[in-house]
Swiss-Prot record:
InterPro entries: Aminoacid_DH-like_N_sf, Glu/Leu/Phe/Val/Trp_DH, Glu/Leu/Phe/Val/Trp_DH_C, Glu/Leu/Phe/Val/Trp_DH_dimer, Glu/Leu/Phe/Val_DH_AS, Glu_DH, Glu_Leu_Phe_Val_DH, NAD(P)-bd_dom_sf. Its EC number is 1.4.1.4. One of its GO terms (biological process) is glutamate biosynthetic process. SUPFAM superfamilies: Aminoacid dehydrogenase-like, N-terminal domain, NAD(P)-binding Rossmann-fold domains. Homohexamer. Keywords: Acetylation, Isopeptide bond, NADP, Oxidoreductase, Ubl conjugation. NAD(+) binds at residues 174-203. This is NADP-specific glutamate dehydrogenase 1. Signal peptide: none annotated. Present with 77500 molecules/cell in log phase SD medium.
């Protein structure tokens, strides 16, 4: 069976490990690879519901429970027509290592449903969620497997899924994260991935410039227009940066003078009703007051002028090798991924070559991989689990402070492990290799201790 997305994720981890001195210094870790690459459990199930026309529909549901050595399975649910086992295995495999970098007790998993929610009524979406949870509820629990949202599963869907679980199991427990604030959710959870991405990028800037620079005055190109992109954009604007692009599946918007926080707010409210960026630009007054250019069928990378920072926040493989070259030519110095596997292997090679061959800071290009740069969402999910177990709610200041601490600790671990096990950067160490090595060692040690590997 061909599983290209999973194979790409697996080979990226293995290549980092093979290119390091880890197996030379600790040959016993090599035994972990064939074990950790196989999920502990894959659950596939039929989901049927009645649509608004009174017709029965059916779709394939999945939950990949990948690894629980570090804690309960933890990872999102994706409702999208592209959902298949290869994509969920790739996401679940990445989730194992990403979760380990948070420093919280979480394993890795991923699930979803192959369905398109666009154009469906709230009532039908509720029926879909209840039908999906009817089977999933047999396999999850607050100490077993704690799903969250992902593409196609936002606050509304989490609410329906949680209500279904509570109804089927007669139990109120922290079995899902991303819940509403008045029924067990955490403050800062919607913002967490975007904010965390910016905090990680800020740590990159601090390290590379010895604390001399920040987001202030930086030109930032962002893709996507969902939660991650919106909150990353708002945090960049708050920190004094200029956001020059956003995008969706149909095209992108470019603003050389900068997209405003008011425009981001309009995008946020309109996206709830599945409006495209093209519709939003034409319908909302904030876009007539502060002009932007809409480019149909395009990603932003080759359409922006000079940029300092690129934050892919849309979907997998959204930055090609040629687009990576264009970004480097336009002056980009920092790339950090808000999307999972946002850059193709060819694009990562372009960024990593620009880093490893640089002879001085002014030439260096630094790439922050998704398993480190975008773990803010799952980190705050872990904090939501902690709050649920204590039946308390933390303040937004405390959650934000914990998020910053987790992102900075993650960055420092990536640096430390890269320095210890790799020697390929004169100016800056590889965060790709650092993240892969650090997370692999954490998971491997837990598996050795518990007898999963012997």
């Amino acid at each position: 069976m061909s599983e290209p997305e999973f194979q790409q994720a697996y080979e990226e981890v293995v290549s980092s490990l093979e290119d390091s001195t880890l197996f030379e210094q600790h040959p016993e870790y090599r035994k972990v690879l064939p074990i950790v690459s196989v999920p502990e459990r894959i659950i596939q199930f039929r989901v049927t519901w009645e649509n608004d026309k009174g017709e029965q529909e059916v779709a394939q549901g999945y939950r990949v429970q990948y690894n629980s050595a570090k804690g309960p399975y933890k990872g999102g649910l994706r409702f999208h027509p592209s959902v298949n086992l290869s994509i969920l295995k790739f996401l679940g495999f990445e989730q194992i290592f990403k979760n380990s970098l948070t420093g919280l007790d979480m394993g890795g998993g991923k699930g979803g449903l192959c369905v398109d929610l666009k154009g469906r009524s709230n009532n039908e979406i509720r029926r879909i969620c209840y039908a999906f949870m009817r089977e999933l509820s047999r396999h999850i629990g607050q100490d077993t497997d704690v799903p969250a949202g992902d593409i196609g599963v936002g606050g509304r869907e989490i609410g329906y899924l949680f209500g279904a679980y509570r109804s089927y199991k007669n139990s109120w427990e922290g079995v899902l994260t991303g819940k509403g604030l008045n029924w067990g959710g955490s403050l800062i959870r919607p913002e967490a991935t975007g904010y965390g991405l910016v905090y990680y990028t800020q740590a990159m800037i601090d390290y590379a410039t010895n604390g001399k620079e920040s987001f202030e005055g930086k030109r930032v190109t962002i893709s996507g227009s969902g939660n991650v992109a919106q909150y990353a954009a708002l945090k960049v604007i708050e920190l004094g940066g200029t956001v020059v692009s956003l995008s969706d599946s149909k095209g992108c918007i470019i603003s050389e003078t900068g997209i405003t926080s008011e425009q981001v707010a309009d995008i946020s409210s309109a996206k709830v009703n599945f409006k495209s960026l093209e519709q939003i630009v034409n319908e909302y007054s904030t876009f007539s007051e502060n002009k932007v250019q809409y480019i149909a069928g395009a990603r932003p990378w080759t359409h922006v002028q000079k940029v300092d920072i690129a934050l892919p926040c849309a979907t997998q493989n959204e930055v090609s090798g040629e687009e990576a070259k264009a970004l480097v030519a336009q002056g980009v110095k920092f790339i950090a991924e808000g999307s999972n596997m946002g850059s193709t292997p060819e694009a990562i090679a372009v960024f990593e070559t620009a880093r490893s061959t640089a002879t001085g800071p002014s030439e260096a290009v630094w790439y922050g991989p998704p398993k480190a740069a975008n773990l803010g969402g799952v980190a705050v999910s872990g904090l939501e689990m902690a709050q649920n177990s204590q039946r308390i709610t933390w303040t937004s200041e405390r959650v934000d402070q914990e998020l910053k601490r987790i992102m900075i600790n993650c960055f420092n671990e990536c640096i430390d492990y890269a320095k210890k096990y790799t020697k390929d950067g004169k100016v800056l160490p590889s965060l790709v290799k650092g993240a892969n090595i650090a997370s692999f060692i954490k998971v491997s040690d837990a598996m050795f201790d518990q007898g999963d590997v012997f």
